[in-house]
Amino acid sequence: VSTESIRFSKDKNVYSLILYCDRLEMTRLLKQMGAFNAQGSGTLNGRVPVIYSDGNIKFDNGFLFSTPGIGGKIMIKNSDRIIAGIPMDNPQFTQLDLAREALKDFDYHWAKLVFNTIEDTLDMKMELDGKPSNILPFEYRKEFGGFVRVDASSPGSQFQGIKLDINLKLPFNEVLKFGNKIESILN
């Protein structure tokens, strides 16, 4: 990660800078931002405009993307966050459940992350194009017009390709402050 030169002044409280990112490990970044507990391979590149004001960090249309032609693998352990708070009778629940299951072990051709701050919340959009490594416990049912989760007696479905769009809202500054408090306690 690099940036252009910047001058810090004791009289100034607001700073704007652009972070230029080269080959950041995607899974490590997701962990550090408090999004997911992920493992895997693959790197991201891009630029992230940052505004630092009164101890808070804001992102302004930052983006990171995988190197064209070089994919990776992502295995998310705490994928239950995707369906947390969504009632099972919600029409979108099955789509989110399918995405959650796919992200447990997903091979992607390309990935993109977009960062924006809305008030005190980090709005992160993650786009992945690829396919699940394993057969998923879902089958297409014509009467429902979509996929439904099935039990172990069904063969499930082998997906040839899926584009996943995941929207996350994270209390980023709170996570940073909490991490700093723990660090100061441990030291």
How would you describe each model-predicted region?
Residues 1-185:
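Small-residue helix/turn framework positions
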